[in-house]
């Protein structure tokens, strides 16, 4: 039975609010996958239905290998989101936003998992 959702970037503002919403509205188990580059432990929600994993989305297939058959959907918010900092840390931005997102899409396609994706303001540049 698919009773698990994954929220990448689950320790950021949007991800943690989504987790809170799912806890109130569903009975699903939740995994937050976050590298804590901008997310924070302060956004953790103490609930036995939530598991927090520190990892980069680039490694999603390895990190979720044993759980993949239970995953109903992945909500992908785990990206390098700061516009100014994305230009200062271009390699980290490319790894997270391009390669990490590619890994998430590939994992979802290979395992027939629904993907809900939300880009960040960094993907639009300064004029976005």
Where are these regions (language model features)?
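N-terminal Rossmann-like NAD(P)+-binding domain of SDR-like oxidoreductases, especially those catalyzing
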Residues: 1-128
């Amino acid at each position: 039975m698919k009773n698990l959702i994954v929220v990448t970037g689950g320790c950021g503002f949007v991800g943690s609010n989504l987790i809170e919403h799912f806890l109130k509205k569903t009975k699903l188990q939740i995994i937050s996958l976050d590298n804590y580059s901008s997310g924070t432990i302060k956004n953790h929600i103490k609930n036995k239905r939530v598991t927090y994993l520190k990892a980069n989305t680039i490694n999603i297939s390895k990190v979720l290998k044993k759980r993949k058959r239970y995953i109903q959907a992945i909500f992908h918010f785990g990206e390098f989101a700061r516009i100014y900092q994305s230009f200062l840390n271009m390699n980290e931005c490319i790894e997270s936003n391009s390669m990490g997102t590619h890994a998430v899409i590939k994992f979802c396609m290979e395992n027939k998992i629904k993907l809900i994706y939300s880009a960040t303001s960094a993907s639009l540049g300064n004029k976005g």
